[in-house]
């Protein structure tokens, strides 16, 4: 099902990006887009592996024209962006995290005796590899849509997208006047890294998932089963 999963994810991500591009093209050359303002929501990041999970959220947010800031003291991440984009981030992150956790559970269930699929280093490496590969896939899809839209619209939408990106960045910095960055640390496990990449290639987001991305209900994250 790997090829089918890739096709579903590509189609869904293309739909999301095309929607943003079409909206930007609609506002190209006028000032109506400047009346729209970014919003912010908080999404709980449950232990364990909060660093890896928050990095997955950050990766999804960036691919969806949003920004994410993690507060390790509260185990919360704040996502900043325009309402439609933020709603999609919530749904996309939840679905991808559930699929990662399902893959980890299956790996532990079917592993031969003595395999370290339940070790912290294996699971941390799995989630980091999964996030890295998901980021690559989303970036590839986005670039394809932007390239095609540039042919269709002649690039008129690009200044609007840049303006929106700047406003999201300004809104985030106004909310968080002091921010620091740090590397996500996790034990390296070759098997965990390979399994994470495979799970990311198999991960699917279909159009039915996106129907849940209602900006009027954004901010009520769906529960996600914790890893143990």
In which residue ranges do the predicted regions lie?
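Short amphipathic alpha-helical coiled-coil/interface segments
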Residues: 5-19, 127-134
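Extended, helix-rich structural scaffolds rather than catalytic motifs
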Residues: 21-228
């Amino acid at each position: 099902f790997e090829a089918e999963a890739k096709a579903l994810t590509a189609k869904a991500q293309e739909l999301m990006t095309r929607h943003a591009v079409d909206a930007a093209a609609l506002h190209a050359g006028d000032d109506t887009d400047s009346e729209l303002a970014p919003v912010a929501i908080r999404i709980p990041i449950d232990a364990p592996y909060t660093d890896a999970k928050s990095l997955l959220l950050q990766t999804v947010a960036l691919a969806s024209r949003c920004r994410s800031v993690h507060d390790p003291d509260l185990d919360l991440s704040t996502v900043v962006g325009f309402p439609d984009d933020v709603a999609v981030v919530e749904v996309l992150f939840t679905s991808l995290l559930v699929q990662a956790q399902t893959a980890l559970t299956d790996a532990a269930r079917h592993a031969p005796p003595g395999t370290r699929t339940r070790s912290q280093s294996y699971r941390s490496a799995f989630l980091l590899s999964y996030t890295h590969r998901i980021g690559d896939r989303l970036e590839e899809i986005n670039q394809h849509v932007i390239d095609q839209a540039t042919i269709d619209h002649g690039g008129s939408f690009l200044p609007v997208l840049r303006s929106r990106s700047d406003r999201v960045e300004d809104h985030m910095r106004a909310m968080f006047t002091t921010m620091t960055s740090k590397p996500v640390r996790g034990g390296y496990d070759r098997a965990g890294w390979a399994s994470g990449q495979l799970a990311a290639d198999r991960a699917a987001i279909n159009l039915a998932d996106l129907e849940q991305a209602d900006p009027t209900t954004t901010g009520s994250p769906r529960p996600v089963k914790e890893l143990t």
